[in-house]
Curated annotation (Swiss-Prot):
Transmembrane segments: 26-46, 51-71, 94-114, 179-199, 217-237, 261-281
Protein name: Probable cytochrome c oxidase subunit 3
Organism: Rickettsia conorii (strain ATCC VR-613 / Malish 7)
Pfam families to which the protein is assigned, alphabetical: COX3
The keyword Cell membrane belongs to this UniProt entry's keyword annotation: yes
Reactions catalysed: 4 Fe(II)-[cytochrome c] + O2 + 8 H(+)(in) = 4 Fe(III)-[cytochrome c] + 2 H2O + 4 H(+)(out)
GO cellular component, one term: plasma membrane
Topology versus the membrane: Multi-pass membrane protein
Family listed: Belongs to the cytochrome c oxidase subunit 3 family.
């Protein structure tokens, strides 16, 4: 089956298939090196090595630039070159679903560590694992009140899940104004959540190095917070694309927004588990 593809409204090519043959791209290799630089910078920062802040900053900037350029090319493939045919979109959807599946496993490890530590509180004593009074959380840890800031953050994320769904329905109804408004509200809620989380960390009564409880807490909630920031950036991109009119309802021409919504709902669900087990059960 052949398909005509218009390039920049000036000329067209005809493909003999609907599948996407990926063009040569420098971004996978460059992103790998940028991530390596980021890891080196992070390790240097944690150990206080010389020039650590410069290496870390270079890593963050490099990763950000590579991802921006890579995703820009993907958007160009879909909008300008019209290479995102039905099988290509299906492949991208499957890829996003598999990515979220790996994220579920990723957070599952943190929950497994938390439950192992909480249900069987043990510690190292002269190289031997011994039961530590059977108390969880440890007596030296002053936990957060779950129905204070954590509960407010729960309401914020639940409301943001509602607004991103509103944006999706508005897009399906070809209501660009409501779609843009709902996306803006979702972004503001995401920023508000991150601000509240930072406030909570700032006033925490324990540090990352204060035992297994603190390590589990900061790893689980910290990585979730990082995912909220990434999801917020994802939605900001969708906001500007929606204002520009990039998204359409014909042929699922809003796959980028759909993937962002999936990711955001995943972040919501993870937080519900964190709130239930880490904050309520853990306190």
């Amino acid at each position: 089956m052949s398909q005509k593809i218009i390039l920049n409204n000036s000329y067209s090519i005809t493909k003999s298939h609907l599948f996407h043959i990926v063009d040569p791209s420098p971004w996978p290799v460059l992103t790998s090196f940028a991530l390596l630089l980021l890891v080196i910078g992070g390790v240097s920062f944690m150990h206080g090595y010389k020039f650590n802040i410069y290496i870390l900053s270079a890593g963050i900037i490099s990763v950000g630039y590579c991802l921006y350029s890579w995703w820009r090319d993907i958007v160009k493939e879909g909008i300008v070159e019209h290479q995102h045919t039905s099988p290509v979109r299906k492949g991208l959807q499957i890829g996003m679903a598999l990515f979220i599946l790996t994220e579920i496993v990723f957070f599952g490890v943190f929950f497994a560590s938390f439950f192992k530590s909480s249900l069987s509180p043990v510690g190292l004593l002269d190289g031997v694992w011994v039961v530590k009074q059977g108390i969880w959380p440890p007596p030296t840890i002053k936990t957060f009140e779950p129905f204070d800031i954590p509960f407010i953050n729960t309401l914020i994320l639940l409301l943001s899940g509602t607004t991103v769904t509103w944006a999706h329905y508005a897009l399906e109804e070809k209501n660009q104004k409501d779609c843009v408004t709902a996306l803006a509200l979702t972004i503001l809620l995401g920023i508000f959540f991150t601000t509240m989380q930072a406030y909570e960390y700032y006033h925490a009564a324990f540090k990352f190095t204060d035992g297994i409880y603190a390590s589990n807490f900061y790893l689980a909630t910290g990585f979730h917070g990082a995912h909220v920031i990434i999801g917020t950036i994802f939605l900001i991109i969708c906001y500007f694309r929606a204002k520009r009119g990039d998204f359409t309802t014909e042929g699922n021409g809003h796959l980028g927004f759909e993937c962002a919504a999936w990711y955001w709902h995943f972040v919501d669900v993870v937080w519900l588990f964190l709130f239930t087990f880490v904050y309520i059960f853990g306190s």
